[in-house]
Amino acid sequence: MAFTLTNKNVVFVAGLGGIGLDTSKELVKRDLKNLVILDRIENPAAIAELKAINPKVTVTFYPYDVTVPIAETTKLLKTIFAQLKTIDVLINGAGILDDHQIERTIAVNYTGLVNTTTAILDFWDKRKGGPGGIICNIGSVTGFNAIYQVPVYSGTKAAVVNFTSSLAKLAPITGVTAYTVNPGITRTTLVHKFNSWLDVEPQVAEKLLAHPTQPSLACAQNFVKAIELNQNGAIWKLDLGTLEAIQWSKHWDSGI
């Protein structure tokens, strides 16, 4: 079902990163009511730029580390709900690409995403009288087919795809729909700085960047298109400036 972002309230976790900031710029052009950015490090210049793009949109920043205990996330969301009354869309975008940091990669890329999602269900779940909502989780094409030199990162992104697909199937129960946007190799600082697991390929970043990539802006534009298409359960591939829905192959069925 197509979705208009006009006059909506969007919470964007990691909305000041490479792809995140470009996506935030595209979002404010859609005449949101509120864009609430949750990120580890405040960037006043970026916030000012977002406000200047469209002064009609209220842009707010809260410091947030996705690795905090879930109770802290719930407390922060309670503050935001008290301020806005409603949240229409949650974008989970926190991510690191550093297979030297195994525990942190899992904590940021997967556990933090699960905890943030779980926390907002306290407010959205229709079984608790909530209004429902929309969750957009940022995965990666490595969630489909791993970059085998970064198996920890790739594994977390595969987990994001499966978790989100499960959320989508639970929508009739919770009232919360979900989908993933999965960028291909995009020219950001994240790609330039990452390390391979156990240094199995010291030049993994250079080798990846030798192949065709996409600019962050092209990825961001398709990101917002995916939000507007609003297809529950969709697995979007955002690669080389294109937007494509992936058809996931079923190899097993739980039968329940």
From Swiss-Prot:
Keywords: NAD, Oxidoreductase. It catalyses: a primary alcohol + NAD(+) = an aldehyde + NADH + H(+); a secondary alcohol + NAD(+) = a ketone + NADH + H(+). It is an enzyme of class 1 (oxidoreductase). SUPFAM superfamilies: NAD(P)-binding Rossmann-fold domains. The active site is at residue 153. GO terms for cellular component: cytosol. The keyword NAD applies. The keyword Methyltransferase does not apply. NAD(+) binds at residues 12-35. Its EC number is 1.1.1.1. Changing residue 211 to Q: In strain: Gif-sur-Yvette stock 115. GO terms for biological process: acetaldehyde metabolic process; acetyl-CoA biosynthetic process from ethanol; alcohol catabolic process; behavioral response to ethanol; NADH metabolic process. This is Alcohol dehydrogenase. It comes from Drosophila yakuba (Fruit fly).
